[in-house]
Amino acid sequence: MLKQFLILIFALATFVAADPLMEELEGTWTSKSNTVFTGPGFYDPVEELLIEPDLPGISYSFTKDGHYEEALYRVVSNPKNHSCPVASVTYQHGTYEIASNGSVMLTPIAVDGRQLLSDPCNQDDPNVSTYSRYVQSTYFKTYQKYVDPYHGRWTLQIYQFDGSKMQPLYLAYKPPLMLPTYALNPTDAASETDSELNDDDSSKSNSKSRRSRIKRSLENQYRTNAIRQTHDESMDKYWWFSVACLGLGSAYMFLK
């Protein structure tokens, strides 16, 4: 009994290798700074406004039906001039696929990606940032989902295209906190997986209704069903199960 109990504890402490299932990725994941989250608090598509978080960090959200959203706030130091760091705030959303080998491909909606770039030493006006469209597909070689042994939170370890580790992400909301998954730009038309921007008269005629839908979505942002994850209820079950096993093991050793 004691041996079985120790094996169980060891199994719970090990990483849970991710199967290629979208349900595993469902939720909003954020980096350690805990200040960057996807959703309306990062990007306002009506005003086309990127909202700079307090600290750098990254966040990814995934739905179980194949949609994703990314919010990235990155600051890169300049080794030649420490007063000239390059900062970028990037928003994209679209669809994702998980291959049978566990790799993940993110395909953005071309018309919706936005980036705010600050490169003070390589701009005419160092006090002005550059706001532009941004389209960049992303490939992850694989990922792991496991419970962090220190914080007791679900953790997502993503391996980039070259196999290098991305900073770990922690589950913050489930269901995910996201903007609408359809194309948000009401004036430009493009296939949701196009890498080029095209004009289409039929889409322009629907711009008002689409903008209204987006505004209603933003007005209801505080009515979201996304739940902040401070701890996982399944971990409570594991905890009490472990306590029960420990009690049974102790009783067995005592009676023996």
UniProtKB/Swiss-Prot annotation:
Glycosylation sites: N81, N101, N127
Region entry Disordered, spans: 189-216
GO function terms (MF aspect): unfolded protein binding
Species name: Lodderomyces elongisporus (strain ATCC 11503 / CBS 2605 / JCM 1781 / NBRC 1676 / NRRL YB-4239) (Yeast)
Lumenal-facing ranges: 19-234
Signal peptide range in chain numbering: 1-18
This protein's GO CC annotations: endoplasmic reticulum membrane
Residues spanning the membrane: 235-255
Keywords: Endoplasmic reticulum, Glycoprotein, Membrane, Signal, Transmembrane, Transmembrane helix
GO BP, sorted A to Z: 'de novo' protein folding; budding cell apical bud growth
Role description: Required for normal levels of the cell wall 1,6-beta-glucan. Involved in a protein folding machinery chaperoning proteins acting in various physiological processes including cell wall synthesis and lysis of autophagic bodies.
Family statement: Belongs to the ROT1 family.
Any one Pfam family match given in the protein's UniProt record, by short name: Rot1
Cytoplasmic compartment residues: 256
Compartments it resides in: Endoplasmic reticulum membrane
Gene from which the chain derives: ROT1
Residue ranges with Acidic residues bias: 191-200
Primary localization: endoplasmic reticulum
Membrane topology value: Single-pass type I membrane protein
Protein name per Swiss-Prot or TrEMBL: Protein ROT1
UniProt key word Ligase: no
InterPro entries xref list: Rot1 (IPR019623)
